[in-house]
Swiss-Prot record:
Catalytic activity: 5-amino-1-(5-phospho-D-ribosyl)imidazole-4-carboxylate + L-aspartate + ATP = (2S)-2-[5-amino-1-(5-phospho-beta-D-ribosyl)imidazole-4-carboxamido]succinate + ADP + phosphate + 2 H(+)
Protein name in UniProt: Phosphoribosylaminoimidazole-succinocarboxamide synthase
BP term (GO), one: 'de novo' IMP biosynthetic process
UniProt keyword annotations, A-Z: ATP-binding, Ligase, Nucleotide-binding, Purine biosynthesis
Metabolic or biological pathway, per its Swiss-Prot or TrEMBL entry: Purine metabolism; IMP biosynthesis via de novo pathway; 5-amino-1-(5-phospho-D-ribosyl)imidazole-4-carboxamide from 5-amino-1-(5-phospho-D-ribosyl)imidazole-4-carboxylate: step 1/2
Family: Belongs to the SAICAR synthetase family.
Domain of life of the native organism: Bacteria
Native organism: Flavobacterium psychrophilum (strain ATCC 49511 / DSM 21280 / CIP 103535 / JIP02/86)
PANTHER family: PHOSPHORIBOSYLAMINOIMIDAZOLE-SUCCINOCARBOXAMIDE SYNTHASE
EC number: 6.3.2.6
CDD domains reported for this sequence: SAICAR_synt_Sc
Gene: purC
Protein backbone atom coordinates (compact mmCIF):
# COMPACT_ATOMS: atom_id res chain seq x y z
CA UNK A 1 0.00 0.00 0.00
CA UNK A 2 1.35 3.42 -0.94
CA UNK A 3 2.38 5.88 1.74
CA UNK A 4 3.89 9.35 1.73
CA UNK A 5 6.94 9.60 3.98
CA UNK A 6 8.78 12.49 2.37
CA UNK A 7 8.01 15.31 -0.05
CA UNK A 8 10.13 17.43 -2.33
CA UNK A 9 7.78 19.99 -3.83
CA UNK A 10 8.80 23.24 -5.44
CA UNK A 11 5.78 25.53 -5.33
CA UNK A 12 5.66 29.02 -6.89
CA UNK A 13 7.17 31.69 -4.58
CA UNK A 14 8.43 28.99 -2.23
CA UNK A 15 10.93 30.46 0.25
CA UNK A 16 11.86 27.45 2.37
CA UNK A 17 10.73 24.08 3.68
CA UNK A 18 10.79 22.85 7.27
CA UNK A 19 10.64 19.12 7.93
CA UNK A 20 9.18 18.18 11.31
CA UNK A 21 8.75 14.69 12.72
CA UNK A 22 5.50 14.13 10.84
CA UNK A 23 4.73 17.28 8.85
CA UNK A 24 6.59 19.12 6.09
CA UNK A 25 5.90 22.85 6.00
CA UNK A 26 6.43 24.98 2.89
CA UNK A 27 6.79 28.76 3.27
CA UNK A 28 5.10 30.53 0.37
CA UNK A 29 6.28 34.12 -0.10
CA UNK A 30 6.62 34.67 3.68
CA UNK A 31 2.82 34.88 3.82
CA UNK A 32 1.39 31.37 3.70
CA UNK A 33 2.40 28.01 5.09
CA UNK A 34 1.49 24.84 3.20
CA UNK A 35 1.59 22.03 5.75
CA UNK A 36 1.70 18.47 4.41
CA UNK A 37 0.83 15.71 6.87
CA UNK A 38 2.93 12.69 5.88
CA UNK A 39 2.34 9.07 6.88
CA UNK A 40 5.43 9.09 9.10
CA UNK A 41 4.98 7.71 12.60
CA UNK A 42 6.96 9.09 15.53
CA UNK A 43 7.24 7.72 19.06
CA UNK A 44 9.70 8.54 21.85
CA UNK A 45 10.79 11.53 19.71
CA UNK A 46 12.04 9.15 16.99
CA UNK A 47 10.58 8.77 13.48
CA UNK A 48 9.97 5.09 12.73
CA UNK A 49 11.23 3.76 9.38
CA UNK A 50 7.86 2.68 7.95
CA UNK A 51 4.96 4.90 6.93
CA UNK A 52 1.39 4.09 7.99
CA UNK A 53 -1.19 4.17 5.15
CA UNK A 54 -3.74 7.03 5.49
CA UNK A 55 -2.20 8.31 8.74
CA UNK A 56 -1.40 11.76 7.30
CA UNK A 57 -4.91 12.15 5.91
CA UNK A 58 -6.41 11.08 9.25
CA UNK A 59 -4.34 13.53 11.31
CA UNK A 60 -4.92 16.40 8.90
CA UNK A 61 -8.67 15.88 8.71
CA UNK A 62 -9.12 15.50 12.49
CA UNK A 63 -7.01 18.61 13.15
CA UNK A 64 -8.78 20.79 10.58
CA UNK A 65 -12.21 19.62 11.77
CA UNK A 66 -11.35 20.56 15.38
CA UNK A 67 -9.97 23.91 14.22
CA UNK A 68 -13.43 24.58 12.74
CA UNK A 69 -15.13 23.42 15.95
CA UNK A 70 -13.03 25.70 18.18
CA UNK A 71 -12.53 28.84 16.08
CA UNK A 72 -15.31 30.61 18.02
CA UNK A 73 -13.24 30.41 21.24
CA UNK A 74 -9.62 30.48 20.00
CA UNK A 75 -8.37 31.97 16.70
CA UNK A 76 -6.27 29.63 14.55
CA UNK A 77 -3.87 29.77 11.63
CA UNK A 78 -5.99 27.74 9.15
CA UNK A 79 -7.19 29.19 5.83
CA UNK A 80 -7.94 26.18 3.58
CA UNK A 81 -7.55 22.42 3.07
CA UNK A 82 -6.92 21.94 -0.66
CA UNK A 83 -6.03 18.24 -0.27
CA UNK A 84 -6.85 15.51 2.30
CA UNK A 85 -3.22 15.63 3.52
CA UNK A 86 -2.73 19.41 3.33
CA UNK A 87 -3.62 22.44 5.43
CA UNK A 88 -2.82 25.99 4.29
CA UNK A 89 -2.61 28.77 6.83
CA UNK A 90 -1.10 32.09 7.83
CA UNK A 91 2.65 32.30 8.35
CA UNK A 92 3.29 32.39 12.11
CA UNK A 93 6.27 32.57 14.42
CA UNK A 94 5.78 29.53 16.70
CA UNK A 95 6.18 29.86 20.45
CA UNK A 96 9.02 27.65 21.65
CA UNK A 97 6.84 25.75 24.12
CA UNK A 98 4.18 23.11 23.73
CA UNK A 99 1.22 23.54 26.06
CA UNK A 100 0.39 20.12 27.51
CA UNK A 101 -2.78 19.85 29.60
CA UNK A 102 -3.68 16.79 31.64
CA UNK A 103 -7.06 15.96 33.15
CA UNK A 104 -5.92 12.53 34.35
CA UNK A 105 -2.80 10.89 35.78
CA UNK A 106 -1.67 9.06 32.64
CA UNK A 107 1.32 8.55 30.37
CA UNK A 108 4.42 10.57 31.27
CA UNK A 109 2.80 12.07 34.40
CA UNK A 110 1.87 8.59 35.68
CA UNK A 111 5.41 7.34 35.06
CA UNK A 112 6.81 10.29 37.07
CA UNK A 113 4.23 9.71 39.83
CA UNK A 114 5.17 6.02 40.05
CA UNK A 115 8.78 7.11 40.70
CA UNK A 116 7.56 8.97 43.78
CA UNK A 117 7.57 12.44 42.22
CA UNK A 118 4.69 14.69 43.23
CA UNK A 119 5.67 17.74 41.21
CA UNK A 120 5.70 17.97 37.43
CA UNK A 121 6.62 21.19 35.60
CA UNK A 122 6.33 23.05 38.90
CA UNK A 123 2.76 21.80 39.45
CA UNK A 124 1.98 19.74 42.56
CA UNK A 125 0.07 16.49 42.04
CA UNK A 126 -2.09 15.30 44.96
CA UNK A 127 -1.19 12.24 47.04
CA UNK A 128 -3.14 9.01 46.84
CA UNK A 129 -3.83 8.86 43.10
CA UNK A 130 -3.84 5.69 41.04
CA UNK A 131 -2.78 5.65 37.41
CA UNK A 132 -5.55 7.08 35.19
CA UNK A 133 -7.38 8.76 38.10
CA UNK A 134 -8.83 12.18 37.32
CA UNK A 135 -7.04 15.25 38.71
CA UNK A 136 -9.23 17.57 40.84
CA UNK A 137 -8.65 20.21 38.13
CA UNK A 138 -6.68 19.82 34.86
CA UNK A 139 -2.98 20.69 35.15
CA UNK A 140 -0.82 22.42 32.53
CA UNK A 141 2.61 20.80 32.12
CA UNK A 142 4.48 22.61 29.32
CA UNK A 143 7.44 21.19 27.43
CA UNK A 144 10.18 22.91 25.48
CA UNK A 145 9.78 22.43 21.75
CA UNK A 146 12.72 20.26 20.76
CA UNK A 147 14.56 20.42 17.46
CA UNK A 148 14.39 17.27 15.35
CA UNK A 149 16.35 14.47 16.96
CA UNK A 150 16.10 15.99 20.44
CA UNK A 151 13.68 15.14 23.21
CA UNK A 152 11.01 17.58 24.36
CA UNK A 153 11.72 18.47 27.99
CA UNK A 154 9.42 19.38 30.85
CA UNK A 155 9.61 23.00 31.92
CA UNK A 156 7.77 25.01 34.58
CA UNK A 157 5.85 28.21 34.05
CA UNK A 158 8.35 30.08 36.26
CA UNK A 159 11.29 28.80 34.16
CA UNK A 160 9.55 29.81 30.91
CA UNK A 161 9.12 33.35 32.25
CA UNK A 162 12.57 33.53 33.89
CA UNK A 163 14.28 32.46 30.65
CA UNK A 164 12.05 34.84 28.70
CA UNK A 165 10.98 32.03 26.36
CA UNK A 166 7.50 33.59 26.43
CA UNK A 167 6.51 36.94 27.94
CA UNK A 168 4.18 36.85 30.94
CA UNK A 169 1.48 38.70 29.00
CA UNK A 170 1.58 36.15 26.17
CA UNK A 171 1.84 33.19 28.55
CA UNK A 172 -1.40 34.19 30.28
CA UNK A 173 -3.10 34.07 26.87
CA UNK A 174 -1.57 30.64 26.10
CA UNK A 175 -2.81 29.31 29.45
CA UNK A 176 -6.32 30.64 28.92
CA UNK A 177 -6.50 29.30 25.36
CA UNK A 178 -5.17 25.91 26.53
CA UNK A 179 -7.84 25.61 29.22
CA UNK A 180 -10.63 26.78 26.89
CA UNK A 181 -9.61 24.33 24.14
CA UNK A 182 -9.34 21.43 26.59
CA UNK A 183 -12.79 22.24 27.98
CA UNK A 184 -14.29 22.26 24.47
CA UNK A 185 -12.39 19.10 23.53
CA UNK A 186 -13.67 17.39 26.69
CA UNK A 187 -17.26 18.29 25.80
CA UNK A 188 -16.92 17.05 22.21
CA UNK A 189 -15.23 13.82 23.39
CA UNK A 190 -18.03 13.21 25.94
CA UNK A 191 -20.62 13.51 23.15
CA UNK A 192 -18.78 10.65 21.38
CA UNK A 193 -18.59 8.47 24.51
CA UNK A 194 -14.92 9.35 25.03
CA UNK A 195 -12.75 11.00 27.69
CA UNK A 196 -10.08 13.48 26.54
CA UNK A 197 -7.36 12.42 28.99
CA UNK A 198 -4.55 14.75 27.99
CA UNK A 199 -3.47 16.69 24.94
CA UNK A 200 -1.02 19.30 23.73
CA UNK A 201 -1.45 22.54 21.83
CA UNK A 202 0.99 24.68 19.90
CA UNK A 203 0.58 28.38 19.30
CA UNK A 204 2.18 31.00 17.10
CA UNK A 205 2.06 34.72 16.42
CA UNK A 206 0.91 36.13 13.11
CA UNK A 207 2.72 39.04 11.46
CA UNK A 208 0.30 41.46 13.11
CA UNK A 209 1.01 40.02 16.56
CA UNK A 210 -2.13 37.92 17.02
CA UNK A 211 -1.73 34.69 19.02
CA UNK A 212 -3.28 31.74 17.15
CA UNK A 213 -3.53 27.97 17.48
CA UNK A 214 -1.28 26.19 14.97
CA UNK A 215 -0.28 22.66 13.95
CA UNK A 216 -2.67 19.95 15.18
CA UNK A 217 -5.43 19.69 17.75
CA UNK A 218 -7.12 16.72 19.45
CA UNK A 219 -5.56 14.15 17.09
CA UNK A 220 -4.46 10.67 18.21
CA UNK A 221 -0.84 11.86 17.91
CA UNK A 222 -1.28 14.87 20.19
CA UNK A 223 -3.92 13.48 22.54
CA UNK A 224 -4.92 10.50 24.62
CA UNK A 225 -8.53 9.37 24.78
CA UNK A 226 -10.25 6.73 26.94
CA UNK A 227 -13.61 5.10 26.30
CA UNK A 228 -15.98 6.62 28.88
CA UNK A 229 -18.15 3.52 29.26
CA UNK A 230 -16.73 1.34 32.03
CA UNK A 231 -14.02 3.87 32.94
CA UNK A 232 -14.89 3.98 36.65
CA UNK A 233 -15.37 0.21 36.91
CA UNK A 234 -11.94 -0.33 35.36
CA UNK A 235 -10.43 2.16 37.83
CA UNK A 236 -12.14 0.49 40.79
CA UNK A 237 -10.89 -2.93 39.67
CA UNK A 238 -7.42 -1.55 38.85
CA UNK A 239 -7.77 -2.70 35.25
CA UNK A 240 -6.15 -1.05 32.25
CA UNK A 241 -8.22 1.63 30.54
CA UNK A 242 -9.36 1.19 26.93
CA UNK A 243 -7.38 3.86 25.08
CA UNK A 244 -7.71 5.67 21.80
CA UNK A 245 -4.22 7.07 21.17
CA UNK A 246 -0.92 5.98 19.69
CA UNK A 247 -0.02 4.53 23.11
CA UNK A 248 -0.53 1.09 21.53
CA UNK A 249 2.46 1.80 19.25
CA UNK A 250 4.59 2.92 22.23
CA UNK A 251 3.62 -0.27 24.08
CA UNK A 252 4.59 -2.41 21.09
CA UNK A 253 7.96 -0.65 20.87
CA UNK A 254 8.61 -1.10 24.61
CA UNK A 255 7.70 -4.80 24.35
CA UNK A 256 10.20 -5.04 21.50
CA UNK A 257 12.98 -3.41 23.52
CA UNK A 258 12.80 0.17 22.25
CA UNK A 259 12.20 3.36 24.24
CA UNK A 260 14.20 5.86 22.17
CA UNK A 261 17.36 5.43 24.27
CA UNK A 262 20.81 5.70 22.72
CA UNK A 263 22.04 2.40 21.32
CA UNK A 264 18.57 0.83 21.05
CA UNK A 265 17.57 -0.57 17.66
CA UNK A 266 14.17 0.36 16.25
CA UNK A 267 12.29 -2.94 15.82
CA UNK A 268 11.14 -3.84 12.33
CA UNK A 269 7.43 -3.54 11.58
CA UNK A 270 6.12 -6.24 9.28
CA UNK A 271 3.36 -5.54 6.76
CA UNK A 272 0.70 -7.16 8.92
CA UNK A 273 1.54 -4.89 11.86
CA UNK A 274 1.65 -1.78 9.62
CA UNK A 275 -1.84 -2.64 8.30
CA UNK A 276 -3.12 -3.14 11.85
CA UNK A 277 -1.74 0.29 12.89
CA UNK A 278 -3.46 1.86 9.86
CA UNK A 279 -6.74 0.20 10.86
CA UNK A 280 -6.36 1.48 14.45
CA UNK A 281 -5.87 5.02 13.14
CA UNK A 282 -9.03 4.71 11.01
CA UNK A 283 -10.89 3.48 14.12
CA UNK A 284 -9.54 6.49 16.02
CA UNK A 285 -10.78 8.85 13.31
CA UNK A 286 -14.28 7.36 13.24
CA UNK A 287 -14.60 7.34 17.03
CA UNK A 288 -13.20 10.83 17.57
CA UNK A 289 -15.18 12.53 14.78
CA UNK A 290 -18.22 10.26 14.82
CA UNK A 291 -18.18 9.92 11.04
CA UNK A 292 -17.05 7.38 8.45
CA UNK A 293 -13.50 7.71 7.18
CA UNK A 294 -13.35 8.14 3.39
CA UNK A 295 -10.04 6.90 2.01
CA UNK A 296 -8.38 9.27 -0.44
CA UNK A 297 -6.86 7.95 -3.67
CA UNK A 298 -3.33 6.87 -2.71
CA UNK A 299 -2.23 5.51 -6.09
CA UNK A 300 0.05 8.53 -6.55
CA UNK A 301 -0.09 10.64 -3.40
CA UNK A 302 2.71 13.11 -4.19
CA UNK A 303 1.25 13.91 -7.63
CA UNK A 304 -2.23 14.34 -6.16
CA UNK A 305 -0.98 16.72 -3.45
CA UNK A 306 1.12 18.74 -5.89
CA UNK A 307 -1.80 19.14 -8.33
CA UNK A 308 -4.26 20.20 -5.60
CA UNK A 309 -1.89 22.68 -3.94
CA UNK A 310 -0.81 24.25 -7.27
CA UNK A 311 -4.47 24.63 -8.23
CA UNK A 312 -5.21 26.31 -4.89
CA UNK A 313 -2.24 28.69 -5.10
CA UNK A 314 -3.10 29.68 -8.68
CA UNK A 315 -6.74 30.44 -7.80
CA UNK A 316 -6.03 32.20 -4.50
Amino acid sequence: MNTITTTNFNFPNQKSVYRGKVREVYNINDELLVMVATDRLSAFDVVLPEGIPYKGQILNQIATKFMELTQDIVPNWLIATPDPNVAVGHLCEPFKVEMVIRGYLSGHAAREYALGKRTICGVTMPEGLKENDQFPTPIITPTTKADNGSHDEDISRSAILAKNIVSEQDYLVLEKYTRDLYQRGTEIAASRGLILVDTKYEFGKTKDGKIVLIDEIHTPDSSRYFYAEGYQDRQNNEEEQKQLSKEFVRRWLIENGFQGQDGQEIPEMNQEYITSVSERYIELYENILGEKFVKADISSINDRIEKNVLEYLQNK
